[in-house]
């Protein structure tokens, strides 16, 4: 049966709360909002004190924008899409450890278990990729490659 739920977390909610999280961590918001038809990452923020950037691809829950037939299938497709989109934006020469680009994918908390099972920690380590999960109340959890390694080893 098709699912549409107005209580699902949409992409804008994920994006807004990840931005708030990064601002608290010292990153600057340029105030620009990417339209759905525009190309590029959903969030690009520079640290206020040094040349480090965060590039984040955000996804919302299936059913937040319209009817879906398979929640799980749509969720898997969203995960694959986010990973592909962020990897396709890794065209940078800035590779220094403390200045350069940090890449991330951000999802609603309902994606957490599936993403943790799907993305290997060593891929996150080599790609400088972190994970963000947004709760219904707006709280954000950030998981780095080393935290992901501990989670995956304890399963």
Model-identified regions with their sequence ranges:
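Short hydrophobic-acidic sequence motifs that mark active-site Asp/Glu residues
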Residues: 40-44, 53-57, 104
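Acidic-basic catalytic patches of nuclease active cores, encompassing PD-(D/E)XK
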Residues: 1-39, 46-51, 62, 96-98
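Domain-level recognition of nuclease-like catalytic cores that cleave nucleotide substrates
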Residues: 104-155
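Catalytic cores of nucleic-acid endonucleases
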Residues: 60-111
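Hydrophobic, Leu/Ile/Phe/Ala-enriched alpha-helical segments that form helix-helix packing faces
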Residues: 18-26, 86, 90-94, 120-124
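Amphipathic coiled-coil/heptad-repeat helices and related helical stalk/stem segments
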Residues: 15, 39, 82-85, 115-116
């Amino acid at each position: 049966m098709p699912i549409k739920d107005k209580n699902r977390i949409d992409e804008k909610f994920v994006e807004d709360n990840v931005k708030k999280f990064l601002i608290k961590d010292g990153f600057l918001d340029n105030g620009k909002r990417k339209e759905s038809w525009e190309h590029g990452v959903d969030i690009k923020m520079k640290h206020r004190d040094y040349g480090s950037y965060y590039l984040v691809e955000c996804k919302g829950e299936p059913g937040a924008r319209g009817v879906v037939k398979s929640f799980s299938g749509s969720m898997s497709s969203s995960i694959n899409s986010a990973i592909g989109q962020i990897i396709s934006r890794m065209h940078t020469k800035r590779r220094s450890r403390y200045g350069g680009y940090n890449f991330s994918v951000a999802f609603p908390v309902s994606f957490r278990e599936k993403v943790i099972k799907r993305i290997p920690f060593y891929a996150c380590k080599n790609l400088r990729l972190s994970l963000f999960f947004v709760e219904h109340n707006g709280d954000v959890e950030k998981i780095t490659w080393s935290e992901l390694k501990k989670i995956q080893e304890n399963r």
